[in-house]
C-alpha cells in the first residue's frame, strides 16, 4: 500500500491535466468569430472544480485504506483525525467554490455577454451583469440560510452500531456544513435531470454512433442530388409561371422563396460532401475499423455501468438501514456489481484504481458532451443555442458548462451506486474477535473509518430523506432513459457525412 503522500502527488497531476483538458474542450467548441476570455476562464474553472470532486474520491479511499493494517489494527487516533479533517475541508472548499461559480460567476458572465454591443462601454456591461446577478446571489444566500436551519432528525434503527454511527457522524453537523450540503443537494437534483436527458442518451448514442458511422458518400451524394433536382424542378415551375407574365399569389411567392433557400442549402451540403473526401479527411477513412471496435467496447462499458447501477438499486431495497426514512442507505452491499469488485480489489494497489476511476469519469464526461452536441442546448422543445465545433456562442458555452457541471455533481452521487463498497471503506478491514473482516456501517465506529465522500453522501441521504428518495428514484429514471436512448440510437438513421464538416448551420433552410 502506497503512503497517502503519493495520492496527493497524483491528485496534483490530475488537477493540471483537467485544466488543460477543459481548456481544450472550451476552445474546441467556442465560436471562432465570437469568443470571450471571461467565458473561457469561468467555464474552465467550473468544469475543473466539479471533476476534481470526483477525482478526489480515489485519494479519499487511499486515505482511509491506509488507516488500518492488514491485521485489522489502526494508526494513531491523532493521525486519523488530522488526515480526515484535511480531506473533508478540501471537499467543502470544492463544493463552496462550485456554488460560487455556478450561481454567481456564470450568471454574471452570461448577462455580461447578453449586453454586448460595440456602442456600449465595458463599465455599462459590467453594471448590467451585476444587476441581474444580484437575484442569483440572493437565491444562493436563501439556499445557505435554509440549509443552516434544516437539521437531520433521529431515525428508526434497531442496530446499535448503526445508531451510534449516525449519531456520531451524520447528526453531528455544524451550520456551515449543513448549509453547503443542502445547497449542493439542490443543485444535484438538477444534475439528475441533466444526467437523465444528456448523459443517459450519450451513453448509448456515442458508442452506437461509432459503430454505425456516417452514411456512405455515394449514397449521401445520390440523396442530395435527388432532393436538389426536385427543388430545382418545383422552383422552375413557379419561375416560369412568373416569367410568362402571370402574377404569383402570396403563398406561391413564399413557396418559391423557400425552394430557393433549400436549393442553396443543398448546394452547400453537396460542396461540403465533396470536401469531406479530400486531404486529411480522406486519410481518416483508414481508421474507420478502429472506430467500430472502440464503439463496440464503449457500448459494453455503458451496459456495464447501467447493470452495476441497477444491481446497486435493487440491493438498496433489500439491505436498506430503514427504507425511505433513511434515503435507502444500505449497511453493506449484498449484490456484488462488476465495478465494485474490480475497484475494491485494486484499492490496495494505488494508482490502479485511480486509472480505472479516471478512465470511467472521462468516458462518462465524453458521453455527456456527445449528448449535448446531439440534442443541443434546449429548454423543453425550444433550441436555445447550437453546440458544435467552433460555432458555440459565449452564452451557449456558459450554459453548456453549467449542464456539464450539474451532470458531474450527479456523477459524484452515481459513483456511490457504481462501487458502494469501494467508495464507503475502500480496502479497510477490522479485527472482529479472531477474524479480520471488511468494514461496514454496522461495524464498531472506533474500528472503521468511512471515507469522506461516503460520509457526505450519507449525510445528504440521511439528513433530509427527501433528497435520498429523489436520488434513488431519479437513478431509476436514468436507467429508463438510457434504455429509451439505446432504442432511439439503434433505429435512428446514420447522419450525413456533410453535416460533420459544416461550418454553418443550414438545417433550418432545409
Curated annotation (Swiss-Prot):
InterPro entries: LMBD1_LysCbl_Transport, LMBR1-like_membr_prot. One of its GO terms (cellular component) is vacuolar membrane. The chain crosses the membrane at residues 1-21, 41-61, 89-109, 130-150, 179-199, 290-310, 346-366, 396-416, 466-486. Residues 22-40, 110-129, 200-289, 367-395, 487-510 are extracellular. Keywords: Cobalamin, Cobalt, Lysosome, Membrane, Transmembrane, Transmembrane helix, Transport. It is found in: Lysosome membrane. It is a multi-pass membrane protein. Belongs to the LIMR family. LMBRD1 subfamily. Probable lysosomal cobalamin transporter. Required to export cobalamin from lysosomes allowing its conversion to cofactors. This is Probable lysosomal cobalamin transporter. It comes from Dictyostelium discoideum.
Amino acid at each position: 500500500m502506497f503512503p497517502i503522500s503519493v495520492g496527493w502527488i497524483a491528485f496534483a497531476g490530475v488537477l493540471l491535466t483537467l485544466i488543460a483538458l477543459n481548456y481544450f474542450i472550451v476552445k474546441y467548441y467556442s465560436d471562432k468569430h465570437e469568443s470571450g476570455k471571461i467565458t473561457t476562464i469561468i467555464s474552465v474553472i467550473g468544469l475543473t472544480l466539479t471533476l476534481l470532486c470526483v477525482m478526489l474520491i480515489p485519494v479519499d479511499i487511499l486515505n482511509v485504506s491506509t488507516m488500518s493494517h492488514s491485521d485489522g489494527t489502526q494508526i494513531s487516533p491523532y493521525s486519523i483525525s488530522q488526515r480526515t479533517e484535511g480531506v473533508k475541508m478540501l471537499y467543502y472548499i470544492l463544493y463552496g467554490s462550485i456554488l460560487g461559480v455556478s450561481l454567481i460567476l456564470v450568471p454574471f458572465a452570461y448577462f455580461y455577454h447578453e449586453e454586448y454591443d460595440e456602442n456600449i462601454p465595458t463599465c455599462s456591461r459590467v453594471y448590467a451583469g451585476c444587476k441581474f446577478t444580484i437575484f442569483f446571489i440572493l437565491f444562493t444566500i436563501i439556499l445557505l440560510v435554509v440549509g443552516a436551519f434544516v437539521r437531520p432528525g433521529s431515525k428508526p434503527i434497531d442496530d446499535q452500531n448503526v445508531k451510534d454511527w449516525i449519531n456520531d457522524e451524520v447528526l453531528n453537523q455544524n451550520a456551515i456544513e449543513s448549509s453547503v450540503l443542502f445547497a449542493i443537494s439542490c443543485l444535484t437534483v438538477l444534475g439528475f435531470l441533466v444526467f437523465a436527458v444528456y448523459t443517459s442518451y450519450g451513453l448509448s448514442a456515442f458508442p452506437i454512433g461509432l459503430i454505425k458511422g456516417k452514411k456512405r458518400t455515394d449514397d449521401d451524394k445520390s440523396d442530395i442530388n435527388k432532393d436538389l433536382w426536385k427543388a430545382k424542378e418545383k422552383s422552375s415551375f413557379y419561375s416560369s409561371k412568373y416569367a410568362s407574365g402571370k402574377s404569383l399569389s402570396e403563398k406561391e411567392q413564399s413557396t418559391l422563396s423557400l425552394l430557393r433557400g433549400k436549393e442553396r442549402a443543398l448546394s452547400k451540403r453537396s460542396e461540403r460532401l465533396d470536401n469531406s473526401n479530400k486531404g486529411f479527411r480522406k486519410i481518416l477513412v483508414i481508421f474507420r475499423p478502429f472506430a467500430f471496435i472502440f464503439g463496440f467496447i464503449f457500448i459494453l462499458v455503458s451496459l456495464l455501468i447501467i447493470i452495476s447501477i441497477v444491481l446497486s438499486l435493487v440491493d438498496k431495497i433489500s439491505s436498506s438501514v430503514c427504507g425511505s426514512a433513511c434515503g435507502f442507505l444500505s449497511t453493506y452491499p449484498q449484490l456484488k456489481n462488476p465495478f465494485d469488485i474490480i475497484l475494491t480489489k485494486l484499492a490496495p494497489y494505488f494508482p490502479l484504481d485511480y486509472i480505472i476511476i479516471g478512465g470511467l469519469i472521462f468516458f462518462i464526461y465524453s458521453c455527456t458532451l456527445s449528448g449535448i452536441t446531439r440534442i443541443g442546448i434546449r429548454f423543453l422543445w425550444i433550441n436555445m443555442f447550437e453546440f458544435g465545433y467552433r460555432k458555440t456562442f459565449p452564452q451557449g458555452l456558459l450554459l453548456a458548462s453549467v449542464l456539464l457541471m450539474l451532470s458531474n455533481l450527479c456523477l459524484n452521487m452515481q459513483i456511490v451506486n457504481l462501487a458502494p463498497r469501494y467508495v464507503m471503506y475502500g480496502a479497510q478491514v477490522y479485527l472482529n474477535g479472531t477474524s479480520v473482516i471488511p468494514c461496514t456501517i454496522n461495524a464498531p465506529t472506533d474500528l472503521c473509518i468511512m471515507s469522506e465522500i461516503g460520509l457526505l453522501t450519507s449525510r445528504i441521504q440521511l439528513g433530509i430523506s427527501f433528497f435520498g428518495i429523489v436520488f434513488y428514484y431519479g437513478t431509476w429514471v436514468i436507467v429508463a432513459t438510457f434504455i429509451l436512448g439505446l432504442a432511439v440510437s439503434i433505429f435512428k438513421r446514420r447522419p450525413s457525412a456533410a453535416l460533420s464538416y459544416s461550418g454553418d448551420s443550414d438545417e433550418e433552410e432545409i
